[in-house]
Amino acid sequence: MAKSKKSEKTTEKVLMSVVDVEQKYVYDPAEDVYGGGDGVVSWGADNSLPKLLINCAEKSATLKACIDQSINYAMGDGIIVNEEAASWAEKVNRRGLSMKDLINRILADFFTTGNFAIQVIFNKLGQPVELFPLDVAKCRLNKDRDKVIYNKRGFSRWGTAGERYDRWGYADFDPERPTMIYFYNGDGVRKVYNTAPWAAALDDVLTEIEGSRYSLNSVANGFSARYIIEIPDTANLTDEQKDVVVEGIKDHFTGTDANNFMVYWGNDEGKSLEVRKIEADETPERFQAVRQAAKENIFTAMRMSPLLVGTAVANTGFSTDEYMSAYKLYNRTIALGYQDMIKSVIDDITGVENAIEIVPFSISFD
């Protein structure tokens, strides 16, 4: 039996809809873009992805709480530099930065962008003697990933200019160039730059940020109007007189209704003043549901329970027993992995096995 033209059009429309959805996921604004020759690989489609990630981390309350607590849990109750690496115990550079400070800085970059960078300075014997955490947003890799390009002012959109340094692990020590940069980018297999731990919830982070802006605008502008005040026979009123009338209405309205009205200036003679209430819609409820869903997705992407950042769970509140259970699971499956990553990096740079220990995080509600 032949399909009708209407059926064919419906099928075609559905297929096109599916294709449109698929196309949204073919193009990735976070995708690396390779330059010509041995040029800089753009971090994101326009080389400005780090700025977006940093802005999100600073403006999303939920994401910031997750990042801050992730750093705390990964840092444990402190850093111990073992005897074999005693030269790093007091400080790691001439500025007096401690090993704890260094690790805190690179973890902040890691949880924000998924990457971090450390400048390593050598003595004439090729031994590392100073470590400086770099702002990873100001670093880029070349196509072969063996050079780190650093721009102390940061990269502009499509910008590629910067100082080139040998990347740690990709070049032998050169006495003429006593500086290398250790650039961590995960396994670096699928993409040049690692993905932020929360990247799967990027849309949700932006939703929360825009939701906060919407709330601010609503408060600043008195929320939506709840009443229409129709004033008849106003054809001869001047704008100044209308302003006086509006101010008079505000003076007589009180509480939350003081600014929640619209005035309709009618021309009908003999008609009495009329006040009508605008029927409320479900926008606030839907808005709240969207914000709550966004928060939940951010926690999911960070693989954290809201309890771990001190947020009460809906319908259950805050329970110390549930918190301890959530922490034990998070520590065993997530935090220890981050700690192993950090210890491996420090071992690699210092050339000392088990150079540091991270004191287990202790929790007491006494």
Where do the language-model regions lie?
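Structured, contiguous alpha/beta core segments that scaffold functional sites
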Residues: 1-266
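Short acidic DE-rich linear segments
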Residues: 2-3, 364-366
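A contiguous, surface-oriented mixed alpha/beta subdomain in the mid-to-C-terminal portion of proteins
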Residues: 189-345, 356-360, 366
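His/Asp/Glu-rich mid-to-C-terminal helical/loop segments that flank catalytic regions of hydrolases
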Residues: 349-350
